[in-house]
């Protein structure tokens, strides 16, 4: 939850690629409605995945929050050809990557500034933070590389291995 100047709290949902830690989908709203927030982040992630090899065989991992295991979200995951996966209840390690990204978002953006003026202000700040996260922020889990660099190196290596001798 994110503090807003006009009273209600804002909420942000992220979808990330586990391999490169890239945030591939995100959305902000003033409610955690299952028909809005997580689905918007999922739709963005699926658009990104479709342009990077497709969605078949991908796994959508989430916690047991009602917004993620509800019929609307699980139906959409299935329509994309993805496999649903949820963590075990009461196990904080099962969703550690998501918790880490959420913690970084709050530490690096949310708690460093005054409350957001409105939803548009939150969305703009989140857009800038996600762009920075993917292209500039060094991640210890990636050997102090950015998600973009990790992907670039991976695809260059794949192309080199596929090239004829």
Feature map (PLM): residue ranges:
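Charged DNA-binding/catalytic regions of mobile-element recombinases
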Residues: 1-165
């Amino acid at each position: 939850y994110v503090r807003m100047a006009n009273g209600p709290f804002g909420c942000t949902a992220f979808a990330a690629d586990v391999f490169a830690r890239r945030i591939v989908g995100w959305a902000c709203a003033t409610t955690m409605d299952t028909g809005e927030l997580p689905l918007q982040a999922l739709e963005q992630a699926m658009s990104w995945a479709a342009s990077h090899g497709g969605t078949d065989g991908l796994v959508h991992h989430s916690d047991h929050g009602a917004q993620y295991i509800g019929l609307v979200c699980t139906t959409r995951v299935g329509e994309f050809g993805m496999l649903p996966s949820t963590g075990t209840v009461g196990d904080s390690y099962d969703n550690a990557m998501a918790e880490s990204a959420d913690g970084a978002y709050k530490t690096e953006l949310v708690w460093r500034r005054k409350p957001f003026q409105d939803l548009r202000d939150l969305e703009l700040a989140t857009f800038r933070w996600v762009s920075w996260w993917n292209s500039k922020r060094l991640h210890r889990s990636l050997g102090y590389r950015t998600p973009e660099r990790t992907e670039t190196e991976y695809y260059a290596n794949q192309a080199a291995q596929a090239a004829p001798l």
